Structures are given as C-alpha cells and as structure tokens.
Amino acid sequence: MKPVNVAVVGATGAVGEAMIEILESREFPVDTLYPLASSRSAGKSVQFRGKHNTVQDLSTFDFSQTPIGLFSAGGDISAEYAPIAASAGCVVIDNTSHFRRDKDIPLVIPEVNPEAIADYRSRGIIANPNCSTIGMLVALKPLYDAVGIERINVATYQAVSGTGKAAIEELAGQTARLLNGKAPEPEVYPKQIAFNAIPHIDAFQDNGYTREEMKMVWETQKILGDPNILVNPTCVRVPVFFGHAEAVHIETREPISVEQARSLLEAAEGVTLLDRHEAGGYPTPVTEAAGADPVFVGRVRADISHPRGLNLWVVADNVRKGAALNSVQIAEVLLSEYLQSVS
C-alpha cells in the first residue's frame, strides 16, 4: 500500500500513545505522522520510528493534509473537531462514544463487521466501539454465526486504564498509601479503588443501569445488526491497571456442544483459546491480556441451568484491542479496500 499521512488526535494520552506504537509495530504505511493534542500539550514530543515528532495544536491543524485521523481525546473534542476533519477530506476513526449511536455512522470491529466500514462515506466518520463490547463480540461472533444467540448475560471486571492516566495514578497512589497506613483519598473514583471493586462505570441511567452497561446493549445490537438480541450487563471497575475481564453467559438459538464451541473459537480470527481444566489453565488480564493483541477465551463450559446455555471467560487489553489496536485495524481495512487511490 502507498504510504499516507496519518493524524493522531490525543497523541499524549494512554490510547493515543498506544495508537502510535501500534502504527509502528504493525508497519502501517505512514508517510508523515501528525501527533495532535490540546494547546497545553502542544510542543511535547512523541517517538515514532526512532524519531521525535513534535505534538501540534489540534485547534490550528489543517486536516486536508491527511486522509486518516485517529481520534482519542474525549467526546467533546471529537464532537467539535471530527466534523471539521471529515469536511476537509480526512476519514475520522473515533475512539470516543460520541458518534456510536448515530445511525449513519458505522460502528466497527474488523473481526465482526468489516463490511460496515464502507458506510464511512456517509459522514466521513467511523466509530470505534466500547472496549468491553469489542472483547465480548470478538469472542462471540463465531458462535453467533454458527448457532445464533438470543441472550447475553455479562459481568465485566474493568481495569482502571479505561478511565485514563489519572485513574492509573490513583490506583498506584492509593495502593502505596494504604500499605503505609494512610487514608486512600479517592478523587477520580467515588470510592476507594485500591483493594476494592466498584459496580459503577459512567453515569447512572433512569433504568438503574449505568451508561457503560447500556453501551454494551446498544453497541451489540448495532454491530451485529440484530435489534432482538438481549444483553444484560453489569460493569465493575477493579484494581487492575490494564486488561478487562468478562464472565459471559449466552443462550443460543440452537444447541451447541462445548467441543463445537471450542473448535469455533480456536479457528476464530483474533481469538486465542486458553482452556485447560487445571490450575492456571485459563487467561487473566495481567498474565495474558496486558500488552497483547488477541482476545483470550477460557472456562468454556455448558450452562448447567439452561439447555442451550454456554459460559465463557473473556479477557483483552482494553487499551490495545479495546481501543488503539481496533482503530488501527479499521484504518488498515479502510486504506487497503477503500482509499487505495489516495495520493
């Protein structure tokens, strides 16, 4: 593929930094990289291919210079600047939740619905799903295609990096304070996160669910193109730095054996099956997922309470596959299949 210019908006954040690293490690054909951020971060330096690149001020950047823009600087920034970039001819791949529910903007996981990328022509924007939705659907897509899924019950155990750098620092700081006999002093989260579990991610909705939980419902239905699939989530923040875990329980339309499910998962793109019935024969966020690209699946077993039930344990790096990697994978398909004529 012919090299193209790429802009990374939010280049100094955790996801932006990961995007730049993944562009390099996957040898994405970047001609010139434009790291962008707010005025207070402009002037900082990021490394790409062994060279220092100066972070530019997003507010003054001319997006007509680049055909692809990876956005991960928060919903308000995307709301303001993604349409500006798109109107200048830059296809925006947005990692925030701002555009995900818009009917004319595709919501894409390349292993699940790559064909939806074609709809970028509507507004010049492609939305990246929520990190928990990505991991779950990469694991469930082969099962959904084979036997159908009527209902998903899922409990997530989400790392603090999903909140951002301040949350990573808060967990580290609280852990040190508590081990030294000091009060935890929560600021990012409403309660202590160190040595704790908080069943509250994003704002509470009128129905008692949080917005994070409802994202998993809306996004699953949109990505699969199945408004009838039922999703019942509980999202929990846990004291882990990187890597989300999910206990997933599905009810299938047609019966499927554990052996059939394992075979489908072993052959699935983007999935690594680690499922031995022994101590340590399963993936965890820290030992397998953190810093890795695949979605790991283990604890595959029949639901003893339901004739068409199946249980899985799913883990993935929320900053990589849950955000930065998925965005770069979208860009790869976009460039190879739709933008090849870009000069």
Protein language model annotation of sequence segments:
Residues 10, 184, 188, 204-211, ...:
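A short glycine-/small-residue-rich loop at the edge of a beta-strand within enzyme catalytic domains
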Residues 231-343:
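C-terminal active-site/capping subdomain that shapes the small-molecule cofactor and substrate pocket
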Residues 124-135, 208-217, 322-326:
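A glycine-rich, Thr/Ser-enriched phosphate-binding loop motif common to dinucleotide/cofactor-binding enzymes
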Residues 170, 191-199, 241-245, 250:
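Active-site-proximal catalytic alpha-helix in oxidoreductases
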Residues 1-193, 228-230, 263, 281, ...:
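N-terminal Rossmann-like NAD(P) cofactor-binding subdomain of oxidoreductases
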Residues 194-241:
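Oxyanion-binding "anion nests"
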Residues 39-41, 131-132, 156-163, 197-205, ...:
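Glycine-rich beta-alpha junction loops
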Residues 120-127, 196-207, 312-314:
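Helix-loop-beta segment of a Rossmann-like dinucleotide-binding subdomain
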